[in-house]
Amino acid sequence: MSGSRLEQVEYRPFPNEEGRNSRQVQWEIPTLVKALSLPAGGRILEVGCGRGIALPVLDRLCGPRRLAGLDIDGELLMEAADNLREHGTEAELHRGDVRQMPFADEAFDVIVDFGTLYHIARSQTALDEIARVLAPGGTFVYETKASQFLSHPVRSRGRRLPALADHGLRRRRWAMLWASRTKAQAASSR
């Protein structure tokens, strides 16, 4: 992204990242695709794609006509490129900030976030960008900390869901997919 300054966001890996990646590939993503009826042949963007673990799975299960990953960390994107090659997956990889994405308006039918948004300062700006690049009728799937939600369900819903509405997104449905740490939700653009 020329002309913009990328800020390094604090990243704390999951305590058992290898185990998490295995669960994500074998169970979480397939369950998510089925539960939310993610469309085949669409345009999919993963924000905060990191090492690109989810991209081959999304490619295999959804057969998108466009698949892209965005991450702020160039080193992780190099690992993602290696991972894509190993799996024979074709996807665009972009270095950039979710708060200022290098994509045209309404460029994606599905945007997925497997735990990036809650690490970002000024997440309202990120939601503005997500709403901008999400096509009408598209789906935004994001992961939140379930422990926060379960401790304070009313406060959590009151804080996050109006923020989605402010950005032209409405809650479509949500599903508890991750038993202990996180929760997946989906919002659709109007």
Where are these regions (language model features)?
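A short acidic, Gly/Pro-enriched loop at the edge of an enzyme's catalytic core
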Residues: R99-V110
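A short SAM/SAH-binding and catalytic strip from SAM-dependent methyltransferases
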Residues: V110-R122
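A short glycine-rich, Lys/Arg-flanked "PGG" loop and its adjoining helix->strand segment in the class I
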Residues: Q124-P136
